[in-house]
Amino acid sequence: MDITSDVRANVLSQSFMLTRTMDYWGRTGGLSLVLPYRYVETHSGDFRASTRGISDIGMLWQINLFGGPALSREQFRSFIPETFSSFHFYLGTPLGEYDAHSALNPSSNRWVFSPTVNYSYTPDQGWTWLETYITTTVFTTNDNYQVAGASKLGQDPLVIIEGHASRNITPEIWLSLDSYYNVGGETHIDNIAQDNAANTLRLGTGIGIRAWGGGDIIVNYERVVAKPSQQPESQTIRMTLRQFW
């Protein structure tokens, strides 16, 4: 591998999420199963490597704090959206495909605990939304990291602050402007800090379309616009398909 060459990585991540909505004391909630699949490819000069497989299977629990009452299907159709806040808790498991001797893996081979609180404000009954999300992610240590003579990989907690502004153009189409600020998350190999903590700002935009009965298509684009010198340049294109029953 030519260490003077730039390193480029491409990640294709696909996730299937199945959610069961629930009634928690009159508030909307839900429990989701997340089944991810990941393809990772990297190259530098003449060096190339890739891997693919099932990533870390996860579960997501959510409960509304205010503004989101539990509704029947008939009530949901006529419900007028209002300002709301919710709590989300994601649990990532070390159940994906993992090779301890490879630095490139679909799975990270560790547990992940990630609570999120959001506040979503609408001044006009759901046509305009101003939203913020605050997430803290805590990682356990990967004690089976056997790359280049190492034995374990750890990571500091990572904080993500999101801001979103969206506007319905029609009842079926909406546009969004998005921002993400990441801080922390430095990794440690055998307790040696890797000087790769995030202090990163990403900006993006998105479009959503209600394409069929109970179904949405959402496309987002994001790009890193401010970062420490040791952090990589990054662009993300994401497409989400949702079906409600």
Go through each PLM region and give its residues.
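Surface-exposed loop and membrane-interface regions of Gram-negative outer-membrane beta-barrel proteins
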Residues: 2-9, 24-66, 185, 189
